[in-house]
Design a protein with these regions (language model features):
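Acidic (Asp/Glu-rich) sequence patches and key acidic residues
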Residues: 1-109, 113-118, 128-129
Length: 129
């Protein structure tokens, strides 16, 4: 089995080296955070509904992009739906870099509420692992 190397283009705010955003403290990953935020029953709990859980996650205006490597993860808080990944040996066509103003507003509101500073911008990064 080989090593995967991916290029990632995403619109968001880089968290910086050795930085996991404060709102992520106590959670295993961003999906775990979203599941807690949703208030829906979690996997294994009575009433858990995967379809509702997935719908909540996909409708949330923010996503987290991990880059660098699995051994040394770095994060970008991103506007959901802006991430494009090109794996080694493949090219992806970028047809538009426009980001919907409503999505940007919802993203900025989330960042303000969670103490994430900076302005979103297009970031090109890589993932090795």
């Amino acid at each position: 089995m080989g090593t995967s190397t991916d290029a990632i283009l995403v619109y968001g705010i880089e968290c910086g080296e050795d930085c996991v955003p404060e709102f992520m403290e106590g959670f295993d990953d961003f999906d775990d955070y979203l599941d807690d935020l949703s208030g829906l029953p979690k996997w294994g709990e009575a009433g858990h509904d995967f379809v509702k859980q997935k719908a909540f996650r996909e409708s949330f205006p923010v996503s987290m992009t991990m880059h660098c490597s699995y051994e040394y993860p770095m994060y970008i808080v991103a506007v959901r739906g802006t991430e494009t990944i090109a794996s080694r040996g493949y090219a992806n066509e970028i047809t538009s870099i426009a980001v919907d103003e409503e999505k940007i507003s919802a993203f900025k509101e989330f960042c303000e509420k969670n103490g994430i500073e900076g302005q979103p911008k297009w970031l090109l990064c890589s993932m090795w692992g």
